[in-house]
């Protein structure tokens, strides 16, 4: 059994990790940490886990994280970069669900996240954990930077087009919508029910922290810098990311065939039939990304629709997918989940 520890198990990504790992046949949950909730049983905070997780939260100092095979960090940005070094030195593999190891340019990361990076040496070796691109590198990684939710939906949507050199990488547009769980579990006015329901708004228009992450990933595939306009929106739903992506075609190509061919072997990417429009509820609770590609009126504009559950394929599910790769398991182990309906 793979001994697993979770640092920061009280947020939405933490409880989603617990939900998925509690039914994983090859995992033994050994430690779940929270300084604030130390001593509290996990199922007292999350009754949904009653009968599935028989552990209490402990402080990071009390938890034997060094005795784990792998530790997940489901913490705010800036925590993993301080704690991961000693774990890696002890032979523990690390999967960070925050942004500490995603951006290779340290100065760029510090600009967007407003703090000095504590372990740039780990950034240099960390593998960006988007399996559909970096599967082989993830298998041998000591540190995996789990992608963000928007970056997952956007990169999977643009990937086949960029690989085929079918679009102009200088003029990409990502118009994205997220449910309120993407903002985390902390109490904030803009995510209160009375504030978020019956409303719809853009945010981060001048610049969002996921922008450099998306640009970095797409540029690596394109072999050149990309021009990307990224505008996220907050929608009155709990879970889900919907990305509407626009690009200018450089050549005539069978778009449906291109996407079907690229993702034919991918368990967690579902290319819908031509003319489809994926819904966020069709992936709710699952690790699946559903994609549809369109060419309106036969123009030179291609439109890609990409939907994921922000807490699963956009966070905890993808982290478990990476765990499976790192330990030589079938990629879908513990992730064969039928989406919830309604």
Curated annotation (Swiss-Prot):
Pathway: Amino-acid biosynthesis; L-arginine biosynthesis; N(2)-acetyl-L-ornithine from L-glutamate: step 3/4. Gene3D superfamilies: Dihydrodipicolinate Reductase, domain 2, NAD(P)-binding Rossmann-like Domain. One of its GO terms (molecular function) is N-acetyl-gamma-glutamyl-phosphate reductase activity. It is found in: Cytoplasm. It is an enzyme of class 1 (oxidoreductase). The active site is at 149. Its main location: cytoplasm. The keyword Cell membrane does not apply. One of its GO terms (biological process) is L-arginine biosynthetic process. Its EC number is 1.2.1.38. InterPro entries: AGPR_AS, AGPR_type-1, NAD(P)-bd_dom_sf, NAGSA_dehydrogenase, Semialdehyde_DH_NAD-bd. HAMAP family: ArgC_type1. This is N-acetyl-gamma-glutamyl-phosphate reductase. It comes from Laribacter hongkongensis (strain HLHK9). The lineage of its organism: Bacteria, Pseudomonadati, Pseudomonadota, Betaproteobacteria, Neisseriales.
């Amino acid at each position: 059994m793979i001994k697993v520890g979770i640092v920061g198990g009280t947020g939405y990504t933490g409880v989603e990790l617990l939900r998925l790992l509690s039914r994983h046949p090859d995992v033994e949950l050994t430690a779940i940490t929270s300084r604030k909730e130390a001593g509290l049983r996990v199922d007292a905070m999350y009754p949904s886990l009653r009968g599935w997780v028989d552990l209490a939260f402990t402080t990071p100092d009390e938890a034997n994280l060094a005795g784990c095979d792998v530790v997940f960090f489901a913490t705010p940005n800036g925590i993993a970069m301080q704690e991961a070094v000693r774990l890696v030195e002890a032979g523990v593999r690390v999967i960070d669900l925050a942004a500490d190891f995603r951006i290779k340019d340290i100065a760029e990361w510090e600009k967007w996240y407003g703090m000095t990076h504590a372990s740039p040496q780990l950034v240099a070796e960390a593998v960006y954990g988007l399996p559909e691109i970096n599967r082989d590198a993830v298998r041998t990684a000591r540190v995996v930077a789990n992608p963000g939710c928007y970056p997952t939906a956007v990169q999977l949507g643009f990937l086949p087009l960029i690989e085929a050199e079918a679009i102009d990488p200088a003029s990409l547009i990502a118009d994205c919508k997220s449910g309120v769980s993407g903002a985390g579990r902390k109490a904030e006015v803009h995510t209160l029910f009375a504030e978020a329901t019956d409303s719809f708004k853009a945010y981060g228009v001048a610049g969002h922290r996921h922008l450099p992450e998306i640009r970095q990933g797409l540029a690596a595939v394109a072999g050149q810098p990309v021009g990307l306009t990224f505008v996220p929106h907050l929608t009155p739903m709990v879970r889900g990311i919907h990305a509407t992506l626009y690009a200018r075609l450089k050549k005539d190509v069978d778009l449906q065939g291109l996407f079907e061919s690229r993702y034919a072997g991918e368990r967690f990417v579902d290319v819908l039939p031509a003319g489809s429009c994926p819904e966020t509820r069709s992936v709710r609770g699952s690790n699946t990304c559903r994609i549809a590609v369109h060419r309106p009126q036969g123009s030179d504009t291609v439109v890609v629709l990409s939907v994921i559950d922000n807490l699963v394929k956009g966070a905890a599910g993808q982290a478990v997918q990476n765990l499976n790769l790192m330990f030589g398991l079938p990629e879908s182990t513990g992730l064969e989940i039928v989406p919830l309906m309604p």
